[in-house]
């Protein structure tokens, strides 16, 4: 039987761009694991993507996942936009390179073995897991330790 897993994610940036962090909660039955990290210079969208990527990459076998995010960018990107980006060689409709392509490609790879239901939750609206992820993300942003080597200000 396929494991049923819940993932909650959030990203934060102090300035955009600026120091940023992500937070994620992975829940399987009564077990819970949290993920958090901070980057010296990044964007909020990159941190939203990283939260989902890190949690999904932690899964060791195919799972049925409900992933909750307050980022429409992540949810729409992975459920709608990515299909045409891939068809166009990772270009947008106006033939420009997709922003954050390194992370979109990593997320695309991370979802391959799972069945994922992407859910949007309103941020800062009292959703307990989203609030906890927001805290984790802000903690990371307030004490960054990593370089976001894929961040490319353009």
UniProtKB/Swiss-Prot annotation:
What are the RNase H type-1 domain coordinates in residue numbering? 1-142
- Indicate where this protein is primarily found: cytoplasm
Q: Which residues bind Mg(2+) 2?
A: 10, 134
Highest taxon of the lineage: Bacteria
Question: Which reaction is the catalytic activity of this chain?
Answer: Endonucleolytic cleavage to 5'-phosphomonoester
The protein's matches in InterPro entries, at most eight in alphabetical order, are given as:
RNase_H, RNaseH-like_sf, RNaseH_domain, RNaseH_sf, RNaseHI
Record-annotated residues binding Mg(2+) 1?
A: 10, 48, 70
Q: Which GO terms describe its cellular component?
A: cytoplasm
User: Mind listing the GO molecular function terms for this protein?
Assistant: magnesium ion binding; nucleic acid binding; RNA-DNA hybrid ribonuclease activity
What Enzyme Commission number(s) appear in the record?
A: 3.1.26.4
Going by the UniProt record, its keywords in alphabetical order are: Cytoplasm, Endonuclease, Hydrolase, Magnesium, Metal-binding, Nuclease
Q: Does the keyword Transmembrane helix apply?
A: no
Q: Where in the cell is it found?
A: Cytoplasm
Concerning PROSITE patterns, the annotation shows:
RNASE_H_1 (PS50879)
- Supply the name of the protein: Ribonuclease H
Phylogenetic lineage: Bacteria, Pseudomonadati, Pseudomonadota, Gammaproteobacteria, Enterobacterales
Identify the coding gene.
rnhA
């Amino acid at each position: 039987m396929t494991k049923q897993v819940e993932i909650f994610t959030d990203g934060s940036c102090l300035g955009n761009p600026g120091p940023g962090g992500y937070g994620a909660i992975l829940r399987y039955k009564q077990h819970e694991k949290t993920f958090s990290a901070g980057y010296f210079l990044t964007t909020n969208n990159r941190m939203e993507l990283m939260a989902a990527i890190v949690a999904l990459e932690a899964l060791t076998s195919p799972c049925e996942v409900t992933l909750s995010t307050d980022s429409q960018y992540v949810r729409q990107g992975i459920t709608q936009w990515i299909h045409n980006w891939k068809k166009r060689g990772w270009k947008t409709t106006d033939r420009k390179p997709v922003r954050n392509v390194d992370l979109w490609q990593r997320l695309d790879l991370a979802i391959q073995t799972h069945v994922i239901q992407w859910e949007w939750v309103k941020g800062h609206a009292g959703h307990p897991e989203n609030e906890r992820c927001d805290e984790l993300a802000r903690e990371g942003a307030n004490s960054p330790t990593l370089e976001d080597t894929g961040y490319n200000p353009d």
